[in-house]
Amino acid sequence: MSLLHNLLVNIAEQGGILEGVLGDDTGHLFEPTPWKTYDQELPPRGAWEASQKIVADCEALIALLTPTKIKLVTECIANNSTVALGVAADFKVADKIIENGGEVSLGHLAEVCDTDEHKLGSVMRLLCHRHIFAEVAPDVFRNNRHSYELRSETGATGMMLIETEEGYQAGLGWVPTMKDPVTKHDIDPGKGAFAKAFGVDVGVGPWLSTPEGSKRMEKWVAGIPWLSSITVVATRTDLPWDSYGPTLCDVGCGPGSVALDVKKNYPHLNIVCQDLEPMIPVIKETFKGYEDEIAAGRIKIEAHDYFTPQTTIADVYWLRGVVRDYEDDVSAEILRQLIPALKKNPRARVLVNELIVPSLITPPSTANAPASQHLPTEQSAYPSTCHVMSLSTMVLMGGKERTFSDIVKIGEKAGLRFRRFHQFRMFTGTVEFELAPETGRRGSHL
């Protein structure tokens, strides 16, 4: 059978499965409210798996039915959808629609935005075709489910502006850094695309502390927590946190928000949050209100450098977004520092949580099979989102996003053994390791 036939059949089959699992909870697109199951919670695993297959096959179907030159033109000018989203965020269009009673004419919207009606109309119609906002009559707009999230109170506009401003500009430095013989292999953010485009020798983090960068700090303060919140539900739901043992150690925990969320969901767990000394006041602020548990030792906040041997004995060690910041040898060294503690508790697990860069391998022998059948399970979900997210983080922050096999090799180099992969219902995933038997038998070299 042809690729067209197979895609259409599989989309129909997976659609039937999806409807069967969801029942009456079929969601909505044009109402200005979240679809609770998909936007605030997680769909049942069966519905989620069917959704992933449908999206993958629909993307392939669109590519199949799009003329080649149209496909390439669309991709090369897709940056203009970023421009449009930046306009909606900067002018607070979602807020203005709400303030106008939920519906607004283009003329009035341009007036309250103090901008040109024709230019704003071009932006709004582009976004409507991408199902962000809805044009309900000629030149009349409402929020829909997706644009409703762009209310100022959510922090989403902050994230949009990070990408449409710093991210957009930093992207111009990506090709030069890939060609530069000095920087093409370097993952140091001070030598990356952001530094190249902005003419500085530091990454975006230190730059935000400079006089120029501090002017743009407000959107980062709002946007980054919003972005982090996307993965919260999957992080606490898609791992069997209570199956490892009573103590979780978050290594390089940042503000400690992940550990706090796990604690809320599994109150019987003991939590250890570790980061460098300057982060300790921030972590303590995160756990404000938990003073009794801290006093009882059920929550511990420790200053720890993950380049030094781990001395805290726990049942599971969680490293989120740590490995990506370093070259392979350095990442392996960080994991190797856990071995002294793992030898004291050989049943303990190490969880490496990252964007797991997806692949779509299509052998000629199965080229007509639905695209969803070519998606490995040991990679991040939402592959299109994961790919642009991984490139975005490397452009802005340097580092090295990796595939599943890359991370397994790093763990094995550190003296760990791969145990299993946890595919989150999100664009991150977690690789679970344990102490390799041969490592446990050897003396520590740390």
Where are the regions a protein language model picked out?
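Conserved alpha-helix/loop element of class I SAM-dependent methyltransferases that forms part
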Residues: 223-247, 261
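Short, well-ordered alpha-helical scaffold segments within catalytic/effector domains
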Residues: 90-91, 171, 217, 229-234, ...
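Alpha-helical subdomain
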Residues: 1-121, 135-137, 241-446
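N-terminal auxiliary segments of SAM/dcSAM-dependent transferases
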Residues: 3-58, 118-223
